[in-house]
């Protein structure tokens, strides 16, 4: 590792510890030439995940875009930000777990829908109205009725 101060190519590791919730390793180093200390981070170099849109276009999976969608759906709802971030992380992990480099946008959308249903029903309906492109109030009502029926079925099963 090159020293950021003198560019000497050798340094020794003084301390290593997990960082970023175990997704990286923080290393404290000391330069073998100038003696100055610096910090480096080591993380897995993940291959980009590509989302295939309905029209065939491809774009790189954007975690920030997914998070923004969740934040918008959950706006003014009693859903903790940490829970939203954990859910987004879980969706990304699920998408990567299949080992495929490309995923269909519909698969991402369904994971989001299922996750929002668990998080908050109002956020679910908000997202569904955009994702499913409700054209009128009847489409909206149909989705709410499906949600209510699902809740009744769950109550009956208990």
Curated annotation (Swiss-Prot):
Key words of the record: ATP-binding, DNA-binding, Metal-binding, Nucleotide-binding, Repressor, Transcription, Transcription regulation, Zinc, Zinc-finger
Q: Does the keyword Zinc apply?
A: yes
What terms describe the molecular function in GO for this protein?
ATP binding; DNA binding; zinc ion binding
- Residue ranges spanning the membrane: these are none
One GO biological process from the UniProt record? negative regulation of DNA-templated transcription
What detail does the entry give on cofactor binding? Answer: Binds 1 zinc ion.
Read off the Pfam families from this record.
ATP-cone, Zn_ribbon_NrdR
InterPro entries, per the entry: ATP-cone_dom, NrdR-like_N, RNR_NrdR-like
Which coenzyme or cofactor does it need?
Zn(2+)
Residues in unnamed zinc fingers: 3-34
Q: Which residues form the ATP-cone domain?
A: 49-139
Family membership: Belongs to the NrdR family.
Report the function annotation for this chain. Negatively regulates transcription of bacterial ribonucleotide reductase nrd genes and operons by binding to NrdR-boxes.
The protein's matches in NCBIfam families, at most eight in alphabetical order, are given as: transcriptional regulator NrdR
Matches recorded under PANTHER family: TRANSCRIPTIONAL REPRESSOR NRDR
Name it.
Answer: Transcriptional repressor NrdR
The organism named in the record is Desulforamulus reducens (strain ATCC BAA-1160 / DSM 100696 / MI-1) (Desulfotomaculum reducens)
Its gene?
Answer: nrdR
